[in-house]
């Protein structure tokens, strides 16, 4: 039996319960069918139905928000060591079920096994990291003045809403939920409707680890129903959202009446800039990895290659050769590098850019084709002879599609890099240190890597500028969102108090 066949057999064992019972909401430690009916979730591999999923509505969100509100005082006041122990047990539970999580995620999203097996473990790492931060989360400062001893402390903001996307959904859910729980908040989680499976597994793991009922509630469904109700609910004090920029704008409007605090990790049209003095072998590997891994369906993908004109032809020639060798196939095959796109709607969007590129005058140097008709597979694609005014250089395609644009000077490279509505990440390849310092200072991006692909370090800030988001995740920055700063001043003596009415 091949590795693919073994993975399919294991997957079928894990899917049996979903096919039998569907996926229900999980509110206050109990299953709820809800009042919004059901929808079907499909696998992008072969367009088959995986199972039925409860479709959340405003009533379901109200139940979940009230459960989170009721559970908040006890969770907030639980000793930090106890909360830490529970988060560590959640991490251990994720590790124990990592294979199940990865298999389900591959089938649910089309992501390749080679990446999802690592993403599941990364989810456990997120919980372990924030478990270690629990005891210091409330730490503040001592600020002495002439008449007062001033101290600051942090307290959890309250029940929060977490809305997560369909790309690497399990890992990104842990990335948002772990710090919220570590801070002492309770959570209502609304996962993407296109990838509901592993959100159910996560809440099961959390409850088995001892998380009290109501601390983490999961309501499945669509943004226009469950998502909108969550962002508008008065008991929810903050919304953490990962997804499209236009949706982030809608959430801002929906949460305005309740003065909702928001954190957005949104879209990107990220540049990778390669100068003539770079280590071109390593740069080539990084360029390919950062757009074609994870199906190109990630916010930090470097979808614009800015290449110095003196090395353009040689670099693009090698790039075309490598792109044409990328293995597209079944996501559960360990040899597969790119699987199918997430859904019919997204497939139609990504493939529409094949004609858009041609009509705008770009050349399809690699790919630009659909593969088969049993799933949402496309060939990894490279556009050349492009300029930054083209739609393929300005719009987030969110697939395995790279646009190559030449530049003649450092100033021109900087102008092109910044000429986009987005500002999430940028990648710079040069061996000139002074150029790197100069260039990174002027790049309009929240995160920049020099001579490296995206290598995340959990304590560092993660987030973008412009249309790519608001706020930062990671390390103490996560607590700045999920907690409120509180100032207390203690008089150190009988200082003068102004007297009125005497």
PLM-predicted stretches and their roles:
Residues 50-56, 71-77, 162, 272-275, ...:
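Short, well-ordered beta-strand elements within core beta-sheets of diverse protein domains
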Residues 1-45:
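Hydrophobic face of amphipathic alpha-helices that form TPR/SEL1-like repeat modules
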Residues 24, 30, 139-147, 220-221, ...:
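Short gly/ser/thr-rich secondary-structure transition/capping motifs
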Residues 47-137, 147:
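Glycine-rich loop-to-alpha-helix module at the N-terminal edge of alpha/beta enzyme cores
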Residues 139-282, 407:
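Rossmann-like NAD(P) dinucleotide-binding subdomain of oxidoreductase/dehydrogenase enzymes
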Residues 238, 246-387, 411, 450, ...:
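ALDH superfamily catalytic-core signature
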Residues 48-51, 236, 273, 327, ...:
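Conserved C-terminal structural/oligomerization subdomain of aldehyde/semialdehyde dehydrogenase
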Residues 47, 83, 105, 127, ...:
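Residue-level signal for inorganic ion chemistry
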């Amino acid at each position: 039996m091949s590795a693919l066949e073994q993975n399919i057999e294991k997957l079928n064992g894990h899917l049996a319960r979903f096919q039998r019972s569907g996926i229900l909401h999980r509110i206050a430690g109990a299953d709820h069918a809800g009042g919004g009916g059901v929808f079907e979730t499909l696998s992008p591999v072969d367009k088959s139905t995986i199972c039925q999923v409860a479709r959340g509505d405003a009533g379901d969100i109200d139940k979940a928000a009230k459960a989170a509100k009721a559970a908040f005082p006890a969770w907030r006041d639980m000793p930090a060591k106890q909360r830490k122990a529970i988060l560590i047990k959640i991490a251990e539970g994720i590790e124990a079920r990592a294979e199940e999580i990865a298999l389900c995620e591959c089938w649910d999203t089309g992501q390749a096994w080679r990446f999802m097996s690592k993403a599941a473990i990364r989810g456990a790492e997120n919980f372990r990291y924030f478990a270690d931060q629990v005891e210091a989360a409330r730490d503040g400062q001592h600020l002495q003045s002439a008449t007062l001893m001033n101290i600051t402390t942090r307290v959890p903001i309250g029940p929060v809403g977490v809305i997560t996307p369909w790309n690497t959904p399990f890992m990104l859910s842990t990335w948002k939920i772990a710090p919220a729980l570590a801070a002492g908040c309770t959570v209502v989680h609304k996962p993407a409707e296109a990838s509901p499976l592993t959100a159910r597994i996560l809440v099961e793991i959390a409850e088995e680890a001892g998380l009290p009922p109501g601390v983490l509630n999961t309501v499945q469904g669509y943004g226009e129903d469950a998502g909108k109700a969550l962002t508008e609910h008065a008991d929810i004090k903050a919304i953490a959202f990962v997804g499209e920029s236009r949706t982030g704008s809608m959430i801002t409007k929906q949460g305005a009446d309740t003065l909702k605090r928001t954190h957005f990790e949104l879209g990107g049209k990220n540049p990778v800039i390669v100068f003539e003095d770079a280590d071109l072998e390593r740069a080539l590997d990084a360029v390919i990895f950062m757009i074609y891994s994870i199906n190109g369906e990630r916010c930090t993908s470097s979808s614009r290659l800015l290449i110095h004109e003196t090395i353009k032809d040689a670099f693009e020639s090698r790039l075309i050769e490598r792109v044409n060798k990328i293995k597209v196939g079944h996501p559960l095959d360990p040899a597969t590098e790119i699987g199918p796109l997430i859904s019919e709607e997204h497939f139609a969007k990504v493939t529409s850019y094949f004609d858009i590129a041609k009509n705008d005058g770009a050349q399809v140097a690699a790919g630009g084709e659909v593969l088969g008709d049993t799933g949402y597979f496309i060939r990894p694609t490279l556009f050349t002879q492009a300029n930054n005014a083209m739609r393929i250089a300005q719009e987030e395609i969110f697939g395995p599609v790279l646009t190559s644009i030449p530049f003649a000077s450092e100033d021109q490279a900087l102008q092109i890099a910044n000429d986009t509505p987005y500002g999430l990440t940028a990648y710079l390849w040069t061996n000139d240190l002074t150029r790197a310092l100069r260039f990174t200072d002027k790049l309009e991006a929240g995160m920049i890597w020099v001579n490296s692909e995206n290598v995340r370090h959990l304590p560092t800030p993660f987030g973008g500028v412009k249309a790519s988001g608001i706020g930062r995740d990671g390390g103490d920055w996560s607590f700045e969102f999920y907690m409120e700063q509180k100032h207390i001043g203690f008089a150190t003596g009988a200082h003068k108090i102004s007297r009125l009415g005497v």
